[in-house]
């Protein structure tokens, strides 16, 4: 008896127009979350005047936001596995908008800190919410590149914070500026609810809900791919976040005495360099998945070299440009950690697995941001160019520890494929 021909998927199920519309909605959500995330970094000089805080206290703003972000990743991953990206992304953006509204009205350190914590909690849904639905809408060969496009596309949000937000702060002041950011985030939440769908089939709950949280978490944490991905992301993300989220604007304006326009231009270039480096990284990950680890190590080495050169030339605009290039080169390979863990994790656990990996970069960023702030205070708090050289140079210790840890975790990789298999 002749076997029936396999059922063909409709062409619009994957890689079709509807898939790209959904991707656009998710990209908009991440873009506006990134704008809110980085808006405080460009506002540090204004925060100085508004709250009158030390460098270490200012760093607590970002450290607190990132701590909430990192702590929320695994719970958000569990929510994504049970309720899907559309609901979680929309709710996350609403929380981000409320945080920005609270920050606009804040006049004390504790109130502003609580507002930034709200931003961190909502922001925690954005990137992994998009990455979670990509395999449902696109073919496997396209997912690594689209993960990178999501990552670099979110940098448009950093450009928004580097230019319009700075202009608003100059022209309208603190409260109006952050109210405008909140309004933009709420508009993005509406667009996300309209455009994003979890699955081509229209299933409301895209994965099974029968597995217990304990079992799901245990399986993810026992998977060696999770920890390889975690180390990759931790090493890649923190130089970029130190510049974009906290100390980049202060370094250029106070340590180098560059103008607001030049500083904003440099910060926007960080996002553009990430685009330039991220797209090739996504192509490499998709075409040569067995070379992902080597690609990451090469990017880290190039990044360290550019930072050394940049700090040697400081203070100058060229120094800032070179350091920003180095941060972008490292950051572009962070998404390869998601590619690895997604390939070796059961689909019903993708949310919690991706969330776990995503904590890596933000744990390392918390440590690095606070380390820079503490060193600046120990050197007198004047924030001269020399102070920033010493503070940024100390981040080399973090890089060294993380790279050695990655090499140790990777020692038991499968000899043929170069990627760990799930235990």
Which role fits each region the language model picked out?
Residues 71-110:
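Conserved MFS/SLC helix-loop-helix module at the cytosolic interface between two early adjacent transmembrane helices
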Residues 72-84, 277-290, 376:
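Helix-to-loop junctions at the C-terminal end of transmembrane segments
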Residues 115-154:
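Cytoplasmic helix-loop-helix junction between adjacent transmembrane helices
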Residues 40-42, 224-278, 368-373:
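Extracytoplasmic gate region of multi-pass secondary transporters
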Residues 150-198:
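Helix-loop-helix hairpin linking two adjacent transmembrane segments in secondary transporters
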Residues 52, 84, 105-111, 122, ...:
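Helix-breaking motifs and short loop linkers at transmembrane-helix boundaries and internal kinks
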Residues 7-16, 199-230, 423:
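Juxtamembrane intracellular "pre-TM" segments in multi-pass secondary transporters
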Residues 82-92, 286-300:
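Cytoplasmic membrane-interface "Motif A"-like loop-to-helix N-cap segments
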């Amino acid at each position: 008896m002749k076997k029936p021909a396999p059922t063909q998927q409709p062409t619009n199920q994957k890689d079709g127009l509807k898939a790209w519309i959904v991707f656009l909605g998710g990209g908009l959500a991440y873009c506006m979350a990134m704008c809110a995330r980085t808006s405080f970094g460009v506002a540090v000089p204004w925060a100085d005047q508004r709250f009158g805080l030390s460098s270490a206290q200012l760093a607590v703003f970002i450290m607190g936001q990132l701590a909430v972000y990192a702590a929320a990743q695994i719970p958000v991953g569990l929510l994504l596995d049970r309720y899907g990206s559309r609901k979680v992304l929309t709710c996350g953006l609403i929380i981000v908008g409320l945080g920005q509204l609270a920050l606009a009205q804040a006049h004390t350190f504790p109130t502003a800190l609580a507002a930034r914590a709200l931003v961190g909690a909502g922001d925690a849904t954005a990137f992994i919410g998009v990455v979670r639905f990509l395999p449902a809408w696109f073919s496997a060969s396209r997912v690594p590149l689209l993960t990178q496009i999501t990552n670099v596309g979110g940098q448009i949000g950093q450009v928004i914070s580097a230019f319009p937000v700075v202009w608003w702060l100059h022209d309208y002041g603190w409260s109006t500026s952050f109210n405008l950011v909140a309004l933009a985030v709420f508009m993005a939440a509406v667009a996300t609810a309209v455009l994003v769908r979890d699955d081509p089939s229209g299933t409301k709950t895209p994965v099974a809900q029968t597995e217990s949280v304990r079992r799901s978490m245990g399986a993810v944490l026992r998977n060696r791919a999770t920890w390889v991905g975690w180390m990759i992301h931790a090493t890649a993300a923190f130089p970029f976040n130190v510049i974009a989220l906290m100390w980049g604007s202060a370094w250029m304006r106070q340590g180098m005495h560059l103008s607001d326009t030049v500083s904003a231009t440099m910060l926007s270039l960080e996002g553009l360099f990430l685009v330039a480096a991220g797209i090739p990284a996504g192509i490499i990950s998709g075409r040569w998945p067995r070379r992902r680890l080597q690609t990451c190590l090469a990017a880290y080495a190039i990044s360290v070299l550019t930072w050394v050169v940049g700090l040697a030339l400081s203070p100058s605009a060229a120094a800032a440009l070179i350091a920003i290039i180095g941060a972008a080169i490292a950051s572009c390979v962070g998404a390869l950690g998601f590619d690895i863990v997604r390939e070796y994790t059961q689909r019903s656990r993708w949310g919690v697995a991706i969330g776990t990996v995503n904590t890596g970069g933000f744990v390392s960023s918390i440590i690095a941001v606070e380390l820079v702030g503490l060193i600046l205070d120990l050197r007198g708090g004047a924030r001269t160019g020399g102070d920033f050289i010493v503070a940024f140079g100390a981040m080399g210790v973090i890089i060294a520890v993380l790279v050695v840890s990655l090499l140790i975790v990777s020692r038991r990789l499968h000899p043929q494929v170069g990627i760990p298999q799930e235990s």
